[in-house]
Curated annotation (Swiss-Prot):
Similarity comment: family membership: Belongs to the MinE family.
Protein name, as recorded: Cell division topological specificity factor
Residue span of region Disordered: 87-106
Organism the protein comes from: Thermosynechococcus vestitus (strain NIES-2133 / IAM M-273 / BP-1)
Alphabetically ordered keywords of this record: Cell cycle, Cell division
Keyword Cell division applies: yes
Lineage: Bacteria, Bacillati, Cyanobacteriota, Cyanophyceae, Acaryochloridales
Amino acid sequence: MISELLERLFTRTPPSRTTAKERLKLVLAHDRTALTPEILDNLRRDILEVVSRYVELETEGLAVSLESDQRTTALIANLPIKRLKLSPEDAPLPENFPPENEAKER
């Protein structure tokens, strides 16, 4: 608790130049992938919904963004995890994917 307070007091906010640069990168990434802000918001909501089925997420520090270099665009999800909700054996398998054993046999 004290460490969090000290971190908040002594952590510098990024300069506006850095913030503007990150926003420009995001705009360029959106343009390259042709994702509208609505689609990105829906994607962010869906990712959080699915991940939340399995783990409890920390609300502070949640971030989903697009990052691009010259050749590729990546969706980056920073999802701080508090704890697991289910054991891995109890977690349901996605309907679109065969169980791990069947996938190896093919």
